[in-house]
Amino acid sequence: PTLGVLDQRLLYWPIGNGSGIQGKRVVEQWQEAMTAVRLTGGWLAGFIDRPGKRSVLTMLHTLDLDNSGRKISDLYRFDSDIFAGLTDTDLFDTLLQPGERSVVFVDVSQHNNTFAGRDAHNEVCFFYLKTGPGEGHLARVDIPLWVARDKAALGSVHALLVDQCRIIGSYPYVITRADEIAVVGRRDQEELENRIALLLAEQDIHPSATGKQRSKDFARGGKTRFEG
């Protein structure tokens, strides 16, 4: 089977206007694409580098609650105070060794209920993966329920991602390579930037590049294809 790896979460939801007509249609198309992958026999995974969620910590906290009637939404609202800035990354970065993964969890959210309501196989699950030695090399990997329930598929996805991360160090090479291919050529990029600059200048807007963008430009300038 073919594995499709995205550099984002599988539980896609538009920011801001997700409940609008256009937002709902985009989500439906995303879900339809997930179903299409399953029907072709493929696998899906969403790779989130250095995740900042507290899903597992919140779950663990519920086990220590005396008030069983407390709403999950209340836990998420106050989790920053409860955990003093800690995230799931802090937990699993300590527990896992390079190449190891956590058990599989189900994403508990209303958005995930929407996904499962449309196609039960598309309910999003996840696990944490230690992608390299030392601190800071931890990823959250989203997988659909149909992959999570198939032990062979789950094992293969785990092994493939570990193998990909070993090629260039703690990040899947296939995603890096996709970024290389998707990068606009220098001449086209300069033409596009000039047009954007002219439009911004007309509005008396003079933006400066962020540190992140400068680092991406520098890295892309010297990339070469991996020959393994």
Regions found by a protein language model. Give the residues of each.
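Phosphate-binding glycine-rich loops and their immediate beta-loop-alpha structural context
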Residues: 5
